[in-house]
């Protein structure tokens, strides 16, 4: 008999704060839908409330997920997305754009409040049950990595019978402090400390992250916890039947996706585009950067503001619905991902699943994400090599790599590995209690 599975959906509960889902949100959403639909035992969701951490039943959770997908516009047509229309207009026209008009902005407080109300209306008002009353030997699964929020997980210290399994997506602020602000470093230290104290097992998205957990500056217990490595699949939203936008089929543009963080190395791309404009003028392809603003974004926006010559060729936007983002990726010449470091690299597999080639940094996590796909790996700090590779697309539409028949990993296969890991952990726990 399977134990009760309590899946923490704190990231999704906070979803109305943002325009669209982040990569981690997509992972948590996939976990939620899978286990709510397929876990053979009882499955409940854990979220923060005004009354503390509470858990709720399947039916209420499903209503909440449906409401959140509507808030995030996960099912709309790209043609109904105003952000997509603006981006397409920029790509297809030759006039100078007011790039600042596209710049990512925080969601206004009134819209956040409105969308929280929409989420509450979707689920219905309920008090739920205290996490302290979860059934004995339940499995607690947390994949959102909001583990620095100690009050949200401190209850685990009072329930040693609970099998707590955390997903660690990366520890980049600790590994690359020069590319992160002090707050991010402090939060990651809290994540490490809380994980070492409260986790009973770990899930990681790459062998690169598994290696990171073994570094000497981390608590020794992290390296001894049972750890399952399972490479992430493409979000289901990127696998639905879809067609390219015919108006973009001959457009010359590249795309970079993900949070606008210092470690993503967008500065290199801007340096490359400045050089491309100097060399090729109006024949320079356009660069679309689709992502959220972060606390380390300022140098990116300052660079663009200080170099008017690239205003016709570079645009930054956030708030694109997932269908719209996918449509933009589908017609791009290539996806660009020059990150200094990553825990995995979701945009790589999202692009490969659309048949779009990738230029990526030659780092372990990128190699894992791009295995079997048309990926050209380049030094993360060599702007000249990146410029040459981008220019090569003007001569060869497939870039420097060979055309491959990339087969995306399926979530069903992914969860076979995850469920086998949870089953083994559960069996070991029950054996210890006998």
Regions from the language model: what does each represent?
Residues 1-434:
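Carbohydrate transferase catalytic cores enriched for Leloir-type hexosyltransferases
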